[in-house]
Amino acid sequence: MVDFLIKNLSFSYPGSEKYALKNIDLTINSGEFIVISGKSGSGKSTLLRMLKPELSPKGALSGEILFFGKTRDSLSLYESAGNIGYILQNPEYQTVTHTVQTELSFGLENLGTEPDAMRLRIAEISAYFSLEKIMDKKVSELSGGQKQLLCLAGILAMHPKAVIFDEPTSQLDPMASEAFLQTVNKLCRENGITVIISEHRLENIIPLCDRLIVLDNGEIISDSHPKKLSPALFRDNDFINSSMPAPMRIFSQFSEITELPLTVSEGRTTLEKLLKDKAVEMPAPEAPNNKTKEYAVEAKGVWFSYDKKRYVLNDFSMKIPKGCFFAILGANAAGKTTAISLMSGLLPLKTGKINILGQDIKKYKSSELFGKTVAVLPQKCESLFSCNTLEEELITAVKSSGLSREEQKKRVEQTAELTEISGLLTRHPYDISGGEMQRAALALILLKKPQIIFMDEPTKGTDALFKKKYASIIKNLCDSGITVIAVSHDTEFCAEYSDRCAFIFDGRCITDTEPKRFFSENFFYTTASNKTAREFFPAAVTEREVTELCKKSLRS
């Protein structure tokens, strides 16, 4: 049975000559698990919103969308709400009530469900998701993973035929992300619910899906099972080559491999076959760099609580060298965001000491600290935007720079080009994709030219191609003496590009070392490349390192 049938669909946003979607022909069958991927701005979110009438964007539309044989526009609000679920990137935007129980009942109440039937459905879905112990909890007290699970449970209580997810794991740490995707897969396989997911983070989801659909500039360039991806795509398409799971990327470079592994387990088996009877060179681990450094930020003995019931930071201490890219990792609710909020001055320091560039943070005036010394790229970067167009935002950011109008305009143009948003300057900040907004927020921060930049999940919603550009920007900043401190769940990015990695657990910094040592000494919280190859190359933590060592072993 066909859930969605899309015929020759094209769409462009108001005022834009460029198609956001072009000539889309797509059939989505009942019970399929479909992943839609593509670089930022390729049309993923636009396509998903087209499948949900209430969220469909305004603009020039041609073609046809059918849901179970009915045209999309002929669906009543009741039919759409009850049959098509939609999970947003950020669960904060989807929860509307105060407690878990009222959140679960909200959708059912709007559908006019009878009280007895409602109680049964809530009891059933709570048991299925093991929510019984948090039913009376406030939604605001839940972790990111719990909130995302609650949003899903609330939708499933309405018994939909299809559920659409727009980058549902972008706010989650790697372990919470994997657990959430396994839950979604179980729902699809055991209950026949159609699942359509847009994702940049493909490591955990590729092995689960029936089809991988890749968009590029609004057009479908590939639609197949991941194992049937054309080798030519890996050679000719930079996005495919950069964004697939580590085992696929590693072994796509070896002509001896005829079927690419999707998982770490398959990757290990493939590696064993590839290196069978070969002399494997085990590189010696690098010695730690213990040189005395100047510190941009020093925190010592910091304690912090939001409600006086539980300390989020417990005797927290951290030293961040000047001019380095310093990555902070850890699970959701470990205290990472609180730590950088205190170290940047966004939260008031009550207990402990924090020095910024050698001076007590309490001695800084706000006008001296923010902008000139410290800038913060928050996780919810939409809070940085208040103008009607991106161009207005960027011009406002340089008005106080002391530059002439001509110089201001030149700096805005250069920064827009660097962050790849030149073609978006006439757009409203809220009309662009999550990845594009992340790039625009980075442009705002760069225009301020601070000495220390704090970033909270900077690669969230960012495609694999721009991550490389992002890393280059960060390296240039650090080479010029600027310190970049990033909270991140992106283990591959941190392993490849950071200078130091710290791990926060239960409000304390547990370790702080070079990325190679950090990830090679971890067993669970490490990269897929390391998990794939550690039996052969225990110190290799990036795709590049594993590939180079494999090639070296094959030549020996």
What are these regions, as identified by a protein language model?
Residues 138-142, 428-432, 436:
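Conserved ABC ATPase signature
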Residues 60-71, 352-360, 370:
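Conserved ABC transporter NBD signature motif
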Residues 116-134, 395, 406-424:
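Conserved ABC ATPase "signature" region
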